Amino acid sequence: MQAEELQKLYKEQDQILATIFDSKYGSDQEYRLEREHDFTCEKQQRISAAKARWQAARLLVQHAHSQLGYAVQRWDYICRIPAVNSQMRYGIATEVRNYLIAASTNLRNSQGYLKGIDFPYCKTDEVSTLERATNNIYGDMATTERHQHAMNVFRSTFQRSHALLQWFDVVIDKTIDRDLLMAIEELFAKKRELRIERVRLIREKLVELFGAEEAAAAGLDEADLQLDEDGNLTDARRLQEQLSKVNEEELKKQLENVKIVQPEKVQQSKEQEAAVEAAAAAADGDSKSADADEKAPKVEAVPLKELAPPPSEDQLFGDIDSIKKQYEIDMEEFQRAQDVNRARVEQGLQEKLAARKSRKARKMAQQEQTEKLLEESASA
């Protein structure tokens, strides 16, 4: 609703301005400031949209990371179950397989949100390797050697998915959020400049129509053109809050549409589940309570200086320079149109001046002729 309400207010503002200035711009300065405002606004919207895509992709990576962690836990767990309990081992292998399929799919889908971005971790070929290992899972649980080989693939992907999450956080927090804040501040500055110019133009219009006293009575005297610092801060906070609400609403919609793949459940009776737990505890020589306290797999964070660099601005936000170039083209076309209009006005003035001189010359010639005739009549 926030975005719709904002668009409604902008539409009402445009209608009011069109009524006041007869569907024209009040000044060349207003046009220039409005184009600068539109460019800055589009830039801010692009960055906001990029943040929404990155957060949606991060959500998928986060789920994939959790699913990989659980799969590593259960795959490690399976080797502690006696070989005679084949039904239990196959049940856990199926569970691991389902979690790995879900993780692979979520990793691939996350890349779909960020087309043109090369992931430094969990690349496409790494996901393909994980999928091949997943397909061989029932054979890999047959021997210790093959089990360990599969574990190396699963654990490596799990660790690299953690590095990928780190990379996402750095890109979002250190790059996108920084650029978004700068864009919001720049947008506020342009909004303020445009507002001051429009207030000035409206005041001039009121003075033209009703006189200075009526304009002052309307609350648009010179003092209104000077916005104090407290007012600036209030407007800045209001704008930031307004944009934040719109961004949160867009992000919420985006995240609601993210299709997170969950692993297919493996149907097991309570007796089978209890038997699996008891068998694993017996293989370890530990109590059931000690096994229940088993923690998730540990993973070392990548030092920031070793983390992959963030993408370029063009990769993150698209070709923003093209928006700027379009703005410059629009300004050049507007300036040419204004020059043509001024030339036409000047030409019209010159033609009127020439016509006036011509009329004056004819009038003087007629007057001289009349005086000459009068003189001749007087002589006669």
Predicted regions and their residues:
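Extended, amphipathic alpha-helical coiled-coil scaffold segments used for oligomerization/tethering
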Residues: M1-S48, S66-M88
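C-terminal modules of long, charged coiled-coil scaffolds in eukaryotic assembly complexes
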Residues: A57, A64, G69-C79, A83-A380
